[in-house]
Amino acid sequence: MSDRGENGQARIVTVGNVRFGNDLPFVLIAGPCQIESRAHAEGVAAELHAICARLDIPLVFKASYDKANRTSVGGARGVGMERGLDILAGIRERFDIPVLTDIHDIGQCKPAAEAVDILQIPAFLCRQTDLLLAAGETGRTINVKKGQFLAPWDMRNVAAKIASTGNHNLLLTERGASFGYNTLVTDFRALPIMAQTGYPVVFDATHSVQQPGGQGTASGGDRTFAPILARAALAVGVASVFIECHPDPDRAPSDGPNMIPLDQMEETLRRLKQFDVLGKAG
């Protein structure tokens, strides 16, 4: 996908030794939904690092220290910011890979930027101007998830808010659109439309199969469709695929129905790489 922005340029965003570009080999953003413990996060990171080394796929590790938008007030939210950022910084140093986490208010921007490489704006917060500006002002790469309620062309306004800070290290993520109650669908037209901004586009395969609030006090989903949607996105052409994974998804504290079992990741990625090559051929 070679769509150019208004200035005719397709941006390449560099994060450490990883390069995001809509015409470059895809980057994997992967990890568990939330940080459950240091040992758990490091174990998942170690396995992903080994798999990606074997398959020659650039890796960014992701995990959340606080799931602030759980369906129920009783939902597990994570280990908290201070402990979570310490764990993420340790993973970055131990494996020499970029790390990503989400932020939820302007007070989290500066401390998170000191510990991680990519700050992620959750989909529900993608129009919060103060948060976007504060994130942009850190100078870190910003990954903004398109709201389930937002048209893909409206992400141009979101990108412009961050760019107004002078920060053009920006990724735009498609993660499904609301389709009635408790259901998301993926409109693959969104990928080339968002690429017209010139910024690298990410496809979030596992949240795209989420059923928000579909289990009453928790979100449901169907992980079996995530690899299928990821293959379709790579056939269109994207800079990155975002996949949440877990050693035992059915026992995960959040987003278990969507996450890919860790022991299935290598074969999943092997097939995704084939579609990436096909999508970017010629």
Curated annotation (Swiss-Prot):
Gene3D superfamilies: Aldolase class I. Its main location: cytoplasm. Keywords: Cytoplasm, Lipopolysaccharide biosynthesis, Transferase. Its EC number is 2.5.1.55. InterPro entries: Aldolase_TIM, DAHP1/KDSA, KDO8P_synthase. One of its GO terms (cellular component) is cytoplasm. It catalyses: D-arabinose 5-phosphate + phosphoenolpyruvate + H2O = 3-deoxy-alpha-D-manno-2-octulosonate-8-phosphate + phosphate. GO terms for biological process: keto-3-deoxy-D-manno-octulosonic acid biosynthetic process. It is found in: Cytoplasm. GO terms for molecular function: 3-deoxy-8-phosphooctulonate synthase activity. Pathway: Carbohydrate biosynthesis; 3-deoxy-D-manno-octulosonate biosynthesis; 3-deoxy-D-manno-octulosonate from D-ribulose 5-phosphate: step 2/3; Bacterial outer membrane biogenesis; lipopolysaccharide biosynthesis. NCBIfam families: KDO8P_synth, PRK05198.1. Belongs to the KdsA family. This is 2-dehydro-3-deoxyphosphooctonate aldolase. The gene is kdsA.
